[in-house]
Regions:
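Alpha-helical transmembrane segments of multi-pass membrane proteins
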Residues: 1-199
Length: 199
């Protein structure tokens, strides 16, 4: 189970940063790609992740399980689809009503990215709780998991900026990210059904 949770944490970090980079491409047609757009995206992601860390920590207190962990990934996958289906009308609606692109991009970022990012932010604290069995090991467990998650974020950043954006349309990449989340959720759910002795 330890290896599986590390793989899940890696995938979570990968998807978060890939989605953040795609945010710039999503907002660009309406709000440009200036520093204020990236400032809006980064602000929304940081605030959303902080809420996700808080909620993930709270959720992990009572009866943490691999099934619930899998459900976080599945919900994150589902919440990527509104980006594919509704990003254009949401941005057009905001663009026509907020003249200042700074606040327009901030509002659009909030509407589009808060929910999936909050959910994905729950992964890190929940994964720590699943692996901590002794209080004295908690620091080492957390450090290793955050290393793996951040490594996933770094690779997700490079793969998205160097390759995915060049090879695929934004919606195609979002669909692939959603599929990855669903696949790892399925693997986690199957693992949760195995007898504890075999994990």
């Amino acid at each position: 189970m330890v290896l599986l949770i590390h793989i899940l944490a890696f995938c979570g970090g990968f998807v978060i940063m890939s989605m953040e980079l795609l945010g710039g491409r999503i907002l660009a047609p309406y709000f440009g790609s200036g520093v204020y757009v990236w400032g809006s995206i980064i602000t929304v992601f940081m605030l959303s992740l902080s809420l996700g860390y808080l909620q993930g920590g709270r959720l992990s207190v009572n009866n943490p399980s691999l099934q619930r962990f899998a459900a976080i990934f599945a919900l994150g996958a589902v919440l990527l689809y509104p980006l594919i289906l509704f990003a254009e009308p949401v941005m057009e609606f905001i663009f026509l009503r907020i003249e200042d692109p700074r606040y327009g991009s901030l509002m659009a970022s909030a509407f589009l990215f808060i929910l999936p990012t909050v959910i994905l932010g729950m992964i890190s604290p929940y994964s720590v709780r699943l692996l901590v069995t002794k209080v004295e090991e908690s620091g080492q467990v957390a450090g290793t998991l955050y290393f793996v998650s951040t490594l996933g974020s770094a690779i997700g950043t490079l793969m998205t900026s160097f390759y995915f954006i060049l090879w695929f349309e934004v919606n195609t990449v979002l669909t692939l990210l959603s599929v990855v989340l669903l696949m790892v959720a399925g693997v986690a759910m199957l693992a949760a059904r195995q007898p504890s002795e075999s994990r």
